[in-house]
């Protein structure tokens, strides 16, 4: 400090400012990060030293604490956070920290194989998952007693659901539709009324018309000639019971008879 009087005399003196209190410091540990996407279940713990006790902690979730710790905060959400430590003299220290979270868990189910023939139960589906925390557990149709694993077979047609649970207990689900063809059917028509009614002639003609199932169709007649076209020719009235067997592209079978 400098003092000057009216005559211009000057006196200079010094004073030492001593900070008798150490700096406020805080030690923060994130004990648990957010377990599932958009959950608020993280846990953090703070302890402090320095300054003048007691300390007051102001958490940004509204929680307060008086002491020097450790103090634990629960139900913290994803994102950046700040804690203010205030000592007995009103001096403050801000401690920033970040809470992380896993990516959102998504389940996906796809049809690998539809039901091959009408009324069968041989569909196959496959499930996968992204996000969350590995490893995953896959359960089909019944989340408690269902079949487990990413692949599932012997499915009947209709909607099937896969439930996925990750290592943190987060869950997701997806559905898949197992399709089936319509029923394979075949009818026999006396083509153009040229069926032979005269004994001893072989001028009859029958045609089979298949529908449903999965085209293309293969035909086999038990006409004595084993013809394998949709129409059978040169048929005799004496052989009065004709049957055609139709097989579609998935080896489904239907038959019809003509007398």
Segment roles from a protein language model:
Residues 22-30, 104-111, 183-191:
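Proline-enriched interdomain boundary motifs that mark the N-terminal boundary
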Residues 35-45, 114-126, 195-207:
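Short coil/turn motif common to extracellular beta-sandwich-like domains
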Residues 49-53, 130-134, 211-215:
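Short glycine/proline-centered coil/turn motifs in the loop regions
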